[in-house]
């Protein structure tokens, strides 16, 4: 008798239906074989399953066991096949048919308990799309899938193998009374250090740049002396970012579930990601990789912020790898037998000093021109060209800082409203256009359709850009930033003031000769 249970294989962020076929025979020497291009981690499931059976007081069949993971031409990796193999083995031993609309997923420990397993969100999404009625996952993974409606599909959180076997025998849902996923049981987000505009004294120009960046998804570079507030400013953008939309939330949850970052909370189902990798981060950690490939920081920042503090300190190879994701909003990772595409539609925020010591242009700077040149060259022209806005940060006057006890910035609520309003305008404008949700996503054809720039404003743009050396890409980035500024002001057309403001974010550069 052949028993087949259902499971999935996760390839990057894609899911593949897997049939777990189990057969027992009394002929030949008793042994346990797994076929279907099983990796080392899948082969090791044999020992985990034997131990789990023993600890659940189940008789392990003293027969020749063959498990086939179909389709057999795909490499199977991970420990998620423990549960479907164990259930198939038990049902084959006891001649129990498993309904075809049930799906199993999870890793077994030696004592029969189910461990947290990456990718449960992708499993439930797959199961819902394919019409599965019952999904069995580790109880420790249920917080990831609180959004799924039980009327469409029942999701059972299983604590141990004995519990699931009891359900197979009785069919009583009360076996899982403590672990059936409840939509109201979302885990709370642990409090994190709060960065807020209300604590920033001065820096109005930088705050305005952050407002524009949040409203239109524009990349932003802060540069200036150390201690001027570049890092705090960048981290404060999280306060004014709008929550994820439903479709964006699903995209982000898939990514974070695949790497196990939804284990302790499901904050990423609503909050936009904010990734802040250290400058020692490796190339693979940044762009993704490994075998099998896993998402890197640029994918973990999808639909959110990637903040590179001290961007000049990152290896040049790592920075150059950002070219394609910044332009195409995805990254391709190729392997011998396959190619993986990970989404990477993020907003880049970066901070840097003008020189190694940070005090270029003052008496405190001891850096030679050669040292400064070598330092600034780490940020190549193509990377700088892909950053929409360049903002110089000055030190705030000490006299103003000394009055910190009387400082009170009440503009934050208005800034949030402005950002939400501008996002709503863009959502309505680009409704039905694939892969475009903000002004920063616009391609050449969309800029022609939606820029709606006044003739007077266009003349100012032509005159200004003829005097400064900019690329074609920079020209259109100025137009897109102008479009966002007009959206923040509630203006249907791009006016002169919007163009003039956008221009100021492109004129300043990391020129070693610039007098800071």
PLM feature spans:
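Residues immediately C-terminal
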Residues: 110, 306-307, 313-314
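Walker B catalytic acidic pair
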Residues: 303, 309-310, 321
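P-loop NTPase nucleotide-binding/switch module
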Residues: 173-212, 216, 243-298
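Basic, amphipathic alpha-helical bundle interface domains used for macromolecular binding and assembly
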Residues: 35, 41-46, 59-61, 68-78, ...
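Peripheral, non-AAA+ core regions of ATP-driven protein-machinery
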Residues: 1-221, 225-231, 474-475, 492-516
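The Walker A (P-loop) glycine that initiates the GxxxxGKT/S ATP-binding motif of P-loop NTPases
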Residues: 224, 288, 310
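Walker A/P-loop
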Residues: 221-263, 328
